[in-house]
Amino acid sequence: AEDWSKINVVEGFSPDHITHTRFSGEIELGIFEKEMELPGGLKKKTGLHHVTLHNCSIGNNSLIENIPNYIANYRIGSDCFIQNVNLILTEGESCFGNNTEVSVLNETGGREVPIYNRLSAQLAYIIAMYRHRPDLIARLREMIEAYSLAQKSCYGKIGNGVHIVNTGTIRNVCIGDYCQIDGTSRLENGSINSNREAPVYIGPNVTAEDFIVSSGAHISDGVVMSRCFIGQACHLTHLFSAHDSLFFSNCQSENGEACAIFAGPYTVTMHKSSLLIAGMFSFLNAGSGSNQSNHMYKLGPIHQGVVERGSKTTSDSYILWPAKVGAFSLIMGRHVNHPDTSGMPFSYLIEHGNRSYLVPGANLKSVGTIRDAQKWPKRDKRTDPDKLDCINFNLLSPYTIQKMLQGIDTLQGLKQTSGETSECYSFQSTTIKNSSLNKGIDLYTLAVHKFMGNSIIKRLEGAPFSDLNDLHDRLKLTDSLGEGEWIDLSGLIVPKQAVKDEIDRIVGNPDSTLEETESFFQAMHRRYYDMEWTWVCSIMPRWYGKTVDRLSPRDIIRIVRQWNEAVVSLDRMLYDDARKEFSMISRIGFGVDGSTRQRDFDFEQVRGEFENDAFVKMVCKHIEDKTALGNELIGRLETLMTSMPQH
């Protein structure tokens, strides 16, 4: 040691397990008395071997060995294992990635989001997209800067139970508890918010700078990222590269590339040839070769696009930004005319003969759409009890139903304007065929009946009522919020007015905090179904011709029957769509060296029989269950009607 007086040790300390170690500056040491068991069963005594420490504190029972360079300015916790790491240091004061500006959506700037440890998809959405409120953006920037300054330190932190092995350089990185870093190349200026409930894994050949990684994330196999926020339980592997991008909960990115994207929850891109650039996505499934252009070779990469929640891109799909694609759409082919299909959710956007064709509502009868809705909640890998993002998985919500209602009006308006016998109709740089238009109206109508009926049945399910007053009590509003337009805040479906009120509160209150805004999003998420009911009641006059307090038992029976017809009709469409996967065409390639009979047998061994398919069984059971649910409520309402005085 340069100065032994600067070395402080805890009571019970013994130097028996410290060898070939140099100390410099202020040093604090814990005890080294336990053994550490490594993978494969090897046991090692904790201690310090072949390491140089400068201005460091070490907790109890950590093992640090074989550090070719040195460790400087770090607070290292207990039960850590650090081996074969070239260099770990904090240089100067650092905020460890907090307040890093990420030029999301527009590579040239203008929508920068300052990242911080607790950034949620909802707050990032507002910062990126609400530039029409500069007073709000300035206030949020102040709040994030204040938070970041509170994280500022000359000392980095390595939490308890951390393993770092065979790694290159770690510079100005704050590492949370139970993180595992194995074979990583370089980490600079970042925070890894690992914890016991949701440890983070950073694997071989990862290079990252100016970043924040949230709990439960897995990053490995040559990922290269710069100026990125990685949300909870995200999975980035297999040479994926990203810059100036935000990834929120449960995103999965492999092989491809992301530039300036806003990847809301469940954005998935798995293929080498896929490029996501300058777009906002959520619940996306990107096919191989999917890409977009944000550059027209004029004023630079200044264009952006929005693909609303739940959409899919097929192999080799392409969109020339700017464009906006409606929720739960399927994008196939190349689209260069800047379509805006946000008013037509659940549609197919297909290229044919260099034209973009829109098939409204077609995705409502797709098996894939329903399977996605079922698997998203099951694929929520977040184990951290403190969940940063609010995620609503509903396919049908005020957000999508309001668009369907507008879609019905738009499609009917096109018929009136261009004539019912027109072969094709023009809509927002796309073409809609006559047959597609009429089917779209029918499909949207079925979906609205299904959603409205669902909401009413949920209110009355399991709720006893003995007279008309009882019935209307069950249907009363339980939340004052909910009327008007709804929006999707990258996973959180919420009334637009509620967001406006919160923005006004933030701007009008100089003492507002990030914690209060977090609490607002959480409260909106909890109140969703109550606010949804308020919205449903607000559109009953349009859809049913009556306000909720004027509904009679007979009216509700009619609504339930419409709901049941809609549910069964849509389910039968799903059933027929699933059957296509068992057609003769689907059997091509089976039984390669055999007869037709052997081909069919080979197919059944691999794929099973149609009637025994898990999804097909689920659809059939869904029809039975919903029919029984509707009949039960109709029975109770008919009983109520018989007990009511006749006029």
PLM regions: where:
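Long, charge-dense tracts
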Residues: 69-70, 74-76, 80-81, 86-96, ...
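Long, compositionally biased intrinsically disordered regions
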Residues: 352-647
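Glycine-rich hexapeptide-repeat left-handed beta-helix
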Residues: 9-32, 36-48, 65-147, 182-183, ...
